């Protein structure tokens, strides 16, 4: 084959016959040939590389989301770099100048960079930012969670995960605020009692925070709530442990539901009912929006905000 055809085959172009592409790739593998990404970038102006920008990968939520984005990037015959915004110094970092675009989550220090590069934000609730956004189904999912508890007969429902900082009242609303508001509205719409000062239960968004909250809720083997909606699965897993430590039965005394759909929820005792975010859909939508901007650099697009879907997975923690 010609050098042009070989190059197209290695780049996965669909106009090359599949059998030709396979022959070229087999030959390249046998010869130990590796694509020079820097050279390709110089010739085409594209590196076929995406930067995933996050403040950190601690916790299963961020690592799972990063894996889903990586899978979608790979499907598009591209590569992904992971950059931690906590180490960000300026916008001349190699990963940004080398990458075609950025997908960012929880990276407030990088806002100026995102404005100057093709970018998509995940879980962004600052409507003043002119950037495409893909969010979790915080509103619809929270309403579904409360409706599920009510359908299971719960009449005194607490919401666990209020980590609001009174010393920082100007913080941009995030998924926490959306989930708390939607849950409260659904409880009140059902004619059930709810007092913000009493029924928004403080907890950091972690298993340890949930354990501490569970200990605080359990009094001599009893809990004043018969249903608890935890704003993420980490909190819910901690709640299960904290309540169990103090002799409160789930679901016998209180039913518990989480949010996210992380894998650990399948293995807790009892197994955790959860609102599972469509992480794959989140990643696919983000890549679709990003590629539209990368492939049309000279075009102007109004920023879009997309909320992905969810699935309520019923398990033992809310069993009838």
Predicted stretch roles:
Residues 215-320:
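Flexible loop/turn connectors
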Residues 94-95, 150-153, 218:
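Non-catalytic positions within long, well-ordered alpha-helices that form the structural scaffold/packing
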Residues 49-147, 223, 320:
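Alpha-helical recognition/docking segments in bacterial nutrient-uptake
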Residues 5-8, 43-57, 156-169:
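Short beta-strand segments enriched in small/hydrophobic residues
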Residues 51, 98-105, 158-161, 222-232, ...:
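Periplasmic-binding protein-like
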Residues 19, 55-64, 84-90, 134-143, ...:
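Hinge/beta->alpha junction and helix N-cap segments in small-molecule ligand-binding domains
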């Amino acid at each position: 084959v010609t050098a042009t055809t070989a190059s197209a085959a290695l780049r996965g172009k669909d106009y090359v016959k599949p059998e030709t592409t396979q022959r070229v790739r087999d030959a390249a593998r046998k010869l130990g040939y590796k694509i020079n990404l820097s050279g390709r970038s110089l010739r085409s102006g594209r590196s076929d590389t995406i930067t995933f920008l996050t403040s950190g990968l601690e916790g299963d939520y961020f690592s799972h989301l990063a894996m889903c984005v990586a899978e979608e990037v790979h499907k598009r015959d591209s590569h992904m770099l992971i950059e931690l915004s906590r180490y960000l110094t300026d916008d001349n970092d190699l990963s940004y100048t080398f990458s075609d675009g950025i997908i960012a989550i929880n990276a407030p220090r990088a806002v100026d960079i995102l404005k100057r590069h093709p970018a998509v934000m995940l879980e962004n609730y600052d409507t003043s930012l002119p950037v495409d956004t893909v969010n979790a189904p915080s509103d619809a999912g929270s309403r579904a969670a409360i409706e599920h508890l009510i359908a299971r007969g719960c009449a005194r429902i607490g919401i666990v995960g209020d980590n609001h900082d009174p010393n920082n009242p100007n913080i941009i609303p995030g998924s926490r605020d959306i989930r708390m508001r939607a849950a409260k509205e659904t409880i009140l719409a059902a004619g059930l009692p709810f007092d913000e000062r009493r029924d928004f239960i403080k907890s950091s968004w972690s298993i340890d925070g949930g354990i501490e909250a569970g200990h605080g809720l359990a009094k001599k083997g009893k809990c004043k709530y018969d249903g608890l909606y935890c704003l993420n699965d980490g909190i819910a897993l901690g709640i299960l442990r904290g309540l169990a430590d103090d002799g409160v039965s789930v679901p016998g005394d209180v039913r518990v539901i989480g949010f996210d759909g992380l894998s650990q929820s399948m293995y807790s005792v009892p197994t955790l009912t959860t609102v599972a975010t469509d992480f794959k859909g989140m990643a696919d939508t983000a890549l679709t929006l990003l590629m539209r901007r990368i492939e049309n650099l000279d075009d102007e697009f109004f920023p879009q905000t997309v909320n992905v879907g969810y699935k309520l997975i019923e398990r033992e923690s809310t069993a009838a």
